[in-house]
C-alpha cells in the first residue's frame, strides 16, 4: 500500500510535465498501471477474476 503523502504528491500537477506519473486508483501502486482502466495489474487481475470488469476474462487456449 502506498503512503498517503506519496498519493497526495502524485495528485498535484508537477512543475515539469515529464515528472508526472500514473498511480493505481485503488491501491496507489505507481508501477504497471494500465491507462485504459487506471488500475495496476494486481488490482486488474483481482477484479477480472471476480467478474467486476465487463468483457474481460481469463484467457485459455
Swiss-Prot record:
This is Small ribosomal subunit protein uS14. Transmembrane segments: none annotated. Pfam families: Ribosomal_S14. GO terms for molecular function: rRNA binding; structural constituent of ribosome; zinc ion binding. Part of the 30S ribosomal subunit. Contacts proteins S3 and S10. HAMAP family: Ribosomal_uS14_2_B. It comes from Campylobacter concisus (strain 13826). SUPFAM superfamilies: Glucocorticoid receptor-like (DNA-binding domain). Binds 1 zinc ion per subunit. Disulfide bonds: none annotated. PANTHER family: 30S RIBOSOMAL PROTEIN S14, SMALL RIBOSOMAL SUBUNIT PROTEIN US14M. The keyword Transcription does not apply.
Amino acid at each position: 500500500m502506498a503512503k498517503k503523502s506519496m498519493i497526495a504528491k502524485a495528485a498535484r500537477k508537477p512543475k515539469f510535465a515529464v515528472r508526472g506519473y500514473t498511480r493505481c486508483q485503488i491501491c496507489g501502486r505507481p508501477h504497471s498501471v494500465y491507462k485504459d482502466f487506471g488500475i495496476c495489474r494486481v488490482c486488474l487481475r483481482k477484479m477480472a477474476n471476480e467478474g467486476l470488469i465487463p468483457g474481460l476474462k481469463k484467457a485459455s487456449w
